[in-house]
Amino acid sequence: MINVQAKPAAAASLAAIAIAFLAGCSSTKPVSQDTSPKPATSPAAPVTTAAMADPAADLIGRGCAQYAAQNPTGPGSVAGMAQDPVATAASNNPMLSTLTSALSGKLNPDVNLVDTLNGGEYTVFAPTNAAFDKLPAATIDQLKTDAKLLSSILTYHVIAGQASPSRIDGTHQTLQGADLTVIGARDDLMVNNAGLVCGGVHTANATVYMIDTVLMPPAQ
């Protein structure tokens, strides 16, 4: 389990997951590095009674069945993740090991968001390992030394409050400050340009949507 303390700069730069600079490979626009937490612009639905009774009740996405089959029990299972706060739950998810490295200080020692993410109520759009594999090695190398950029990217994947699948569509202000847009429904959900792998995954303090692409904060 990750047990490292959030650094003051990182805690101040957000109020809470996943890492992005995909467009850095294909666009000349700079990535926004304003990491001051902003209030959410769209209300988040509370966790349903059914979800609290059955952690799998809200699952959506074509990748959910495969994930559940590969992780039927233990802390990385759907039921197991529901017992832990989100950063801890992500560290137990084999599809989110790269994300865990990014938010826990392993990728960049000046960016550690574990305590922050574990301490509030959030919706997290979590890029899978396969999503990070799309990024060039040079981008990952840059994030190892650019703490401000990494914090901006990570906080762009988080919105305040837990948004259930029935309420997730629409425009949401992220903790990074910029908006992201969720369209579609259930298996066809899109988060900006990212497709849904498996969403509606509950942790003790968050609702997680695993996505297939790392999101990029828009330039400001």
UniProtKB/Swiss-Prot annotation:
Residues 1-24 form the signal peptide. Its main location: membrane. O-glycosylated. Contains 0-3 mannose residues attached to residues 48-49 in various configurations; the dominant glycoform is Thr-48(Man)/Thr-49(Man2) with an unusual Man(1->3)Man linkage, but Thr48(Man3)/Thr49(Man0) through to Thr48(Man0/)Thr49(Man3) are also seen. InterPro entries: Adhesion/Biosynth-related (IPR050904), FAS1_dom_sf (IPR036378), FAS1_domain (IPR000782). Induction: Highly expressed and immunogenic during infection of mice with live bacteria (at protein level). GO terms for biological process: cell adhesion; extracellular matrix organization. Glycans are attached at T48, T49. It is found in: Cell membrane; Secreted, Cell wall; Secreted. Keywords: Cell membrane, Cell wall, Glycoprotein, Lipoprotein, Membrane, Palmitate, Secreted, Signal. It is a lipid-anchor. A lipid is attached at C25 (N-palmitoyl cysteine). Recombinant, non-modified protein stimulates secretion of cytokines (TNF-alpha, IL-6 and IL-12p40) by mouse macrophage cell lines in a TLR2-dependent fashion, which leads to increased host innate immunity responses against the bacterium. Serves as a strong human and mouse antigen T cell antigen during M.tuberculosis infection, inducing strong IFN-gamma expression. This is Cell surface glycolipoprotein MPT83.
